[in-house]
Amino acid sequence: VLKGPCTTPISEGFRSINVELRRQLDLYANIRPAKTIPGLKGRYENIDLIVIRENTEGLYCGEEIWLNDEKTAAKSMALVTTKASERIVRHAFKYALSNKRKKITLVHKANILKYTGGLFLNTGRRIAKEYDGKIEFWDMIIDNMCMQLVLNPHKFDVIVATNLFGDILSD
């Protein structure tokens, strides 16, 4: 056990201890399984998917500032690097291969976030070419992914995403 349960104040106070631990210890891959439990009735049966979330960058990197003294405007900075994107996408492919998974879906918002989302998407597409014929690769805009995950969860196997999107999808 790394630490006991703790909370982070909402909207003010100290920064998340989890975010700092991830950064200090370079805990870059957050692997979250989502699986139906046999015998437990639910909307779907036989769901078995994995969300792999990049855990050190994105909007959760903690780069926020107030834009004025009145604290009526704030700005957050999303950090996405080629190094971290390559590392998490390669991790997803290695995970998929070693666990006999068939498909990876990379989640992004590159249609709007041209630089950060585009960098993550293009890195994923480049790395996917190295695994062509071994693992099926798809990419999906986060908006559509949320809808598809609710309507058709059986279509997904391994999902790889930036920090914020992976957090939202896996919760």
Residue ranges and their predicted role:
Residues 1-70, 74-75, 164:
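N-terminal glycine-rich phosphate/adenylate-binding segment common to multiple enzyme folds
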Residues 1-11, 135-171:
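Glycine-rich phosphate-binding loop
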Residues 10, 14, 18, 81-89, ...:
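Generic structural signal for well-ordered, non-membrane alpha-helical segments
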Residues 41-45, 98, 129-130, 150-153:
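Solvent-exposed alpha-helices and their adjacent loops that cap or buttress functional pockets
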Residues 70-143:
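Glycine-rich phosphate/diphosphate-binding loop of Rossmann-like nucleotide-binding domains
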